[in-house]
């Protein structure tokens, strides 16, 4: 069985299918790890989510920020934004089945045999992998429970700007969500800067660094695979971490990384681009 991790698809169904051909994906034997943001900005979000849903256990998918946004829109808690491409999902006859499936996806997946953790965005430096798993399970229980809409109503916002173990209520759950689905930069004390999205080296605010470069982060030494950051160059980084978001929807590449080999193998498909980075 081959295991491939794939970066942010964001509704780029045609490129997704091209990449599956490139890796010779066998639906009966292989497994996909999808780093979140299945939907939005690309033209075929409905086709992507239906296809992944249909793969069943052959696909392991973690939630990204665009996936959570879809849940909030479907719940009537957020309007469709001008750049959203979610209307086809919202009007689909199988809408409720897809939305229910989506909110039951994990926020973090760890394969202990391979020693690899899959997330969408990042981990604050205070979290080791056990803490990250515990926090992910905490929020997943809410999203999968009867009060999932209540969390989504309180999800949006950039504060608190730092993880603390004594956080409670919506602030705690929002911070967990922001770390796992939005985090790119923080400072040496673990304070987040969620608004800044550019590539490393362009920081205008002193002290900011990619989350995986914070000195003495508790998860250092763990192999972590993530997406979310289209302006970060794809590839392995010290840590060790592997960045998979090639910015497909922006005209970059859709990226796959084979994980079950001793030396990871990379695969790329060029994308025509459907939106502009903002």
Curated annotation (Swiss-Prot):
Keyword Plastid annotated: no
Keyword Iron set for record: no
GO molecular function per UniProt: bis(5'-nucleosyl)-tetraphosphatase (symmetrical) activity
Enzymatic class: hydrolase
UniProt entry keywords in alphabetical sequence: Hydrolase
Entries under Gene3D superfamilies matching the protein: 3.60.21.10
Recorded catalytic activity of this chain's protein: P(1),P(4)-bis(5'-adenosyl) tetraphosphate + H2O = 2 ADP + 2 H(+)
EC nos: 3.6.1.41
Function of the molecule: Hydrolyzes diadenosine 5',5'''-P1,P4-tetraphosphate to yield ADP.
Similarity comment: family membership: Belongs to the Ap4A hydrolase family.
Protein name: Bis(5'-nucleosyl)-tetraphosphatase, symmetrical
Gene field: apaH
């Amino acid at each position: 069985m081959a295991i491939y991790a794939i970066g942010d698809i964001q509704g780029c169904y045609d490129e997704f299918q091209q990449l599956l051909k490139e890796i010779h994906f066998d639906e009966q034997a292989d497994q996909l790890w999808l780093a979140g943001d299945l939907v939005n900005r690309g033209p075929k979000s409905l086709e992507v989510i239906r296809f992944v849903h249909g793969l069943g256990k052959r696909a392991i998918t973690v939630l990204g920020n665009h996936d959570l946004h879809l849940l909030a829109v479907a719940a009537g808690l957020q309007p469709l934004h001008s750049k959203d491409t979610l209307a086809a999902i919202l009007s689909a006859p199988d809408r409720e089945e897809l939305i229910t499936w989506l909110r039951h996806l994990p926020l973090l997946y760890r394969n202990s045999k391979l020693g690899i953790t899959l997330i969408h965005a990042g981990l604050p430096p205070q979290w080791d992998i056990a803490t990250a798993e515990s926090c992910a399970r905490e929020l997943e229980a809410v999203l999968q429970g009867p009060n999932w809409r209540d969390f989504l109503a309180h999800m949006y916002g950039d504060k608190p700007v730092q993880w603390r173990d004594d956080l409670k209520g919506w602030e705690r759950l929002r911070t967990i969500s922001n770390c796992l689905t939005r985090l790119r930069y923080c400072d040496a004390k673990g304070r987040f800067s969620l608004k800044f999205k550019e590539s490393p080296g362009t920081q205008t605010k002193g002290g900011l660094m990619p989350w995986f470069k914070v000195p003495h982060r508790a998860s250092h030494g763990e192999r972590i695979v993530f997406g979310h950051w289209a302006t970060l160059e794809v590839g392995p980084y010290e840590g060790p971490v592997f960045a998979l978001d090639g910015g497909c929807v922006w005209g970059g590449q859709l990226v796959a990384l084979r994980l079950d080999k001793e030396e990871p193998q990379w695969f790329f498909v060029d994308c025509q681009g459907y939106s502009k980075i903002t």
